[in-house]
């Protein structure tokens, strides 16, 4: 039985007309276009207006990200040949292109028949489109704003040597902390932990990660010195001394992990270690540390799932 009112179809009408969709989901989708459970033309028009504003905001945020990139690229142009600078610019350009690729979905056709509020199936389809469009606009705003912030931080890093050195020192801190943790793990193998072979394999993999990160820091240290030389900025020599210490400690950890290895462990995990080595070989400075960590997580052995 139809529950159509002078204003339009009711939520119950739409639930009855649409098969295979949970009624609560339908009700939630229709909320923006209903008034007291009835679809109205005024509510639809208001929803279109609000959604259009969201879409305009999203495109504006993308334009601001484009402006931020262009400004940063102009500032970086004299030193863009330095890997630490050029690679960051390339990454931002790719991210900007990814954000710009969202623009077509920010331009949906939101026009509707004048009597759509009386058509239950079309009202539902329109409500789905609105939900998807609002979600796409929100995602685009978030992505564009995050990118703009990252680009502004890069520009500040580029223009302020202290910010560059502070960021490098923070990276050194992270690697030193990781070395501390790894040394403690190695000290507990093979007698102080359960599943020592798995602990050893994980430690061996983490050692490879630290070696890659130390090499990445060495490459960035060279780039920071070139930047300082070109801009006549003072250079923090103590950063190089700390990096020397990090490289020495990584070498010691590599030696220690090899010394405690049972030959059977090496044989058992040879393929896993080789697979990680192959993946890490594809990374070149400047390295995205998050991607390296994801590579490690993908290869770490799990004693709870492997046959023992």
Summary of predicted features, one role per range:
Residues 169-308:
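Long amphipathic all-alpha helical oligomerization modules
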